[in-house]
Each structure stands twice: as C-alpha cells, then as structure tokens.
Amino acid sequence: MTLNKVYYSGGEEIRDLTIVGGGPTGIFAAFQCGMNNITSRIIESMPQLGGQLAALYPEKHIYDVAGFHEVPAAGLVDSLWKQAERYHPEINLGEAVTRYRKLDDGSFETTTKSGKVFLSRALLLAAGLGAFTPRTLPQLGCVDHLEGRSIFYAVKNIRDFAGKKVVIVGGGDSALDWAVGLLDAAEHVTLVHRMHEFQGHGKTAREVDEARDKGVIDVYMDTEVTAIETAEGGMKNVTLLRKNGASVVLEADRLLILIGFRSNLGPLAEWDLELVDNALVVDSHMKTSVDGLYAAGDIAWYPGKLKIIQTGLSDAAMAVRHSLNYIRPGEKIRHTFSSVKMAKQKKNEQ
C-alpha cells in the first residue's frame, strides 16, 4: 500500500470527522465519509494502516468477510484502502491519541502523544481493542535479542520460516492455522500445546490431526516449552516438559509463540465514557455517552455485539451516517445508492 503525501496534513484544517484508528473499521469509515460528503481524517498509532491485520496477520487468510470466499489479511486492507483513497482522507500515522476535548461550539479537539492537535466537528473511535501486546513465555527469561530473528509472535512474512525447523506454541486458531500454513514453507513443523485439547476451530484442528497421522507434523499436547539454547546468535534447540515429567529436546531454528495478546484501551479508558467489558457503550446510532462522539468496531459495545470484521464495517457505516445529524444539524439526510454516486463522480472526473 502506498500513501501519497497529498493525504497528509499538519492538522490545522478542521475536518468534519476525525477517525481514531486505521484498521478495517476506520478505513471503511473514511470511505463512508466520502460517500456521505463528509471530510475525514484518520489518526493511527501504528506506522501503517490496517490495524492488527497489517501488523500481526498480513499473510493470514480470512474467510468470513462478505464477498470474499478467501482473502489474505493484507489484501483485504489494500481493497478497503482503494475504496477510501478516492476521497482523499487525511492520514496521520504513528500518532497515538491521548486525549480529547469537546469545545464550546460542540466541535472536538483531539491531541496525540507527540503534542499534535486535530480539530473536527465530530469524533469516531475505531481503535479496535486498543493497544495490544503479545503474550510471552516468561519462563524463557529475557529473549529480546532473539525476537524478530529466532522468536516470533506473528507471521508477517512466510520467508522468515522458509526451510527452518519451526516450533509453534499454542492451541488456538492462530497456532492451528500456521501449523498447517507453514507446512509447505518450513523444513519441519512441531506444534506444542499445554492443554489436552485444542481451542481452535474444529476444521483446522482436524487438519492438524490428519497432518500428524501422515507424519508431516509433530504434535505435543499437555506440554510446555521451558527453555531454549542458542548458538552463534541464533536458536539451536528448545526444551519441552511434558505433563508426565518427561523432558524432550528438539532442534529448532524458529520459535513461533501464538498464545494470544493482551489488549489495553490506554488513555481511552480514562475518558469518562461509559464502558462495558472494556468497550464503549453505544446506542443504536453508534453514539457514546457524549453527543458527537461515536464508536465502531471492537471498541464499541451494544447488546448482542459480535466482534468480527463484518460487524465493524457495518458499525462504521452506521456511525458515519448518523454523525451527519451532529455535523450538519437540521439538514435532511437523503440516501444515494453507491452506483448512482459513483456514476456521477466518474462523469465529473472525465
């Protein structure tokens, strides 16, 4: 994904809507702003758009987004951006929002950690689950010098594992997905799980079982990684401890730890907004407890909320649409079919 400098701004200009978070929900919200003739900006704490999909799972395939029978996470992010970029949303990357202030005229002032201040007529929080850090294996001690070289917490590039002896730790969806997904690239794959049963999707668990039965993957259940040995700055082997007390030493070039992430809303949790289960309570219009401040995606809570990408996209459309009532009060909102709007826009571009 390439972002042209024309999309960047110092924040001096007031926009109709500031979107905090540049994941799928935030990007789609920017597209919806364009469809509704709303000027927008995205503020994203990461150095790239895409949220967790780009930062953690760019090569993971997604199967539950309408219209895509299968799509790589990075491919979905690119598709969403291609929709949004025609409306030239202002993009601010590497900027972590720390506070907001509602001004006397009802507009919003949003401040980032670097001290930048952004003005907008309304505010949309689409920051997912907030800041996230991977769960580690504390029994290994300090392994900072190996992270990104021999020890990984996500698959960002399959080439990092090509031709390597890979030990994967975990029993959830990500661990199972990559136990299968790395079989063709890696020299050998070993899956280690501390529980007796997998917690991931049944279909993928069966694929792992079938691969084990064929002898193309080793699986250790009721087992933990307790130590690693290095040589010449890289990993040489890992030590496993089985529930029965037996110890196993395996040759390994790569240790892929996929046991989940800790999420933290950070400053957002201190904004005096109503929270349930570490998410912001919204009404049927995606409005929080503050007029003009909306939330969408995983950061938003309402009864029956399902935290999947598809729901986040719907939330974004709802939030943007209803923000019009706050941004331009009294204006009659008319629905325009996307095909009609695009036809007019293409005609004007000729």
Curated annotation (Swiss-Prot):
Record protein name field: Ferredoxin--NADP reductase
Cofactors: FAD
Q: Where does FAD bind?
A: 25, 44, 52, 57, 97, 132, 298, 339
Q: Which UniProt keywords apply?
A: FAD, Flavoprotein, NADP, Oxidoreductase
Q: What is its EC number?
A: 1.18.1.2
Protein's organism? Chlorobium limicola (strain DSM 245 / NBRC 103803 / 6330)
Q: How does it assemble?
A: Homodimer.
Family to which the UniProt record says this protein belongs: Belongs to the ferredoxin--NADP reductase type 2 family.
**Record keyword Oxidoreductase present:** yes
The free-text cofactor remark is:
Binds 1 FAD per subunit.
- The record's top EC class is oxidoreductase
